[in-house]
Amino acid sequence: MVLQLGKLETEDIIATGKALQALAYVDPNRIGIMGWSYGGFMASLAITKGADIFKMAIAVAPVTNWRYYDNIYTERFMRTPAENEAGYDGNSPINFVDKMKGKFFLIHGSADDNVHYQNSMEMINALVKANKQFDLFIYPDRNHGIYGGNTRNHLFTMMFDYVLKNL
């Protein structure tokens, strides 16, 4: 994990996906992944680096480039970008979107003060540049928790429906 946030976790997730594919009672064409925050980062890496395994991913408020995340947290594990460019680039989903094959749903709150909205904007730019189709939903003025009013109900209903439709 040191100097390589996401590398070993992604390898584990892909290995788990492969193990699931080998089970007689699992449809290998219906394996998906979802996550929020760091989990959204992992889902984004899984659908790109594990493109042959995962047919769908939902990423809520994902880190897509460690250069945009809280430097006190990130540099504790990764050092600075100048000291560890390979660690930053080798584990940022934006650098692997060309491999993506499955359905991808990106969700973010525009007022997120933890994983800044810029992460999703960077992912969108990378996906468009690679001519990858994806789904996107932005919650205006919602923070990292995406809650308030009917927001949480809306979010979970939308994610549930996405899984039903795409797996």
Language-model regions: role of each:
Residues 1-167:
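Active-site-proximal cap/loop segments of hydrolase catalytic domains
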